[in-house]
Amino acid sequence: MEKPFKFKQFTVKQDRCAMKIGTDGVLLGAWTSVKHNPFSVLDIGSGTGILSLMIAQRSHAEQIEAIEIDDDAYEQCSENFENSPWNDRLFCYHASLLEFVEEVGDSFDLIVCNPPFYSEDYKTENKSRDLARF
């Protein structure tokens, strides 16, 4: 098992996620503006849940929902949410964006996403990593 990624107020485990926490995700979480006091937030392709957790730490949003399509990443994201100080405001759905929109149909005050950036072939030997990159 890998060492968890520790922040001041929470810890993120990432040993089961294909895409690990990187500088871009941490910066996006820090730079995402919450000055308009969002009530509801959606994190698309949440991975470890890092963006949702950082927004929960920095805001008073009452509903922070994340969606993750990969089985292992979904389980790890859910565990990271459960183990956080904001577990009453965080929820992860195991679904694609299309499935989520068709089933839930809510609107959100803030939507965040940290898509992978690949200009050419994204395929690797790891199917979970390929899914996270696509």
Question: How would you name each of these model-derived features?
Answer:
Residues Q63-E68:
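Conserved SAM-binding motif I beta-strand of class I
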